[in-house]
């Protein structure tokens, strides 16, 4: 039901950003550490986009768990208006954003002097701060991997209800009425 609602909303809402608008973009892996050790994580890569001064936080699963430029740039183009300023980390897949109609600014998290702010003061802290609540929500539910896409939509729906101070039950009823015809 919520997935149907999300698909309807996805068609209705336009792209984020535009001239003089800043979009923070980052990718993160959702999953569990293999054997509870080290950095190896089995799971799903998700691309997150958020516009400064907006609550429109978009999460898109990277197809086939691939996060190269050939995969990420079309996703960004689908969700972000050209002319936007995009701020990312130094992941090489973002290196062609300038050639795709965007102003691209980079924060190098491996810079030993300052891994949070770039030298010119730009940062990606807003998108980074949104990963923790999302991952905590998934961690609490311990869902099997095949349920991840639907659960990601449910998380976004619940987040939107909370941010807009809406009753989730009432919104569920509205989604049912909007998506199904009753005789």
Name the predicted role of every residue range.
Residues 1-183:
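Residue-level recognition of single "structural anchor" positions
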């Amino acid at each position: 039901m919520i997935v149907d609602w999300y698909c309807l909303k996805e068609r209705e809402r336009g792209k984020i950003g535009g001239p003089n608008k800043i979009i923070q973009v980052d990718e993160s892996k959702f999953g569990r550490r293999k054997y509870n050790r080290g950095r190896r994580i089995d799971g799903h890569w998700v691309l997150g986009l958020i516009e400064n001064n907006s609550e429109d936080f978009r999460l898109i699963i990277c197809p086939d768990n691939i996060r190269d430029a050939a995969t990420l740039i079309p996703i960004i183009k689908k969700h972000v208006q050209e002319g936007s300023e995009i701020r990312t980390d130094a992941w090489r897949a973002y290196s062609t954003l300038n050639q795709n109609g965007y102003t691209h600014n980079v924060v190098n998290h491996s810079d030993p002097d300052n891994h949070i702010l770039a030298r010119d003061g730009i940062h990606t802290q807003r998108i980074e701060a949104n990963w923790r609540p999302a991952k905590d929500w998934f961690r609490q539910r311990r869902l099997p991997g095949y349920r991840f896409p639907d659960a990601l939509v449910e998380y976004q729906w619940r987040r939107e209800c909370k941010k807009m101070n809406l009753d989730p039950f009432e919104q569920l009823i509205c989604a049912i009425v909007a998506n199904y015809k009753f005789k």
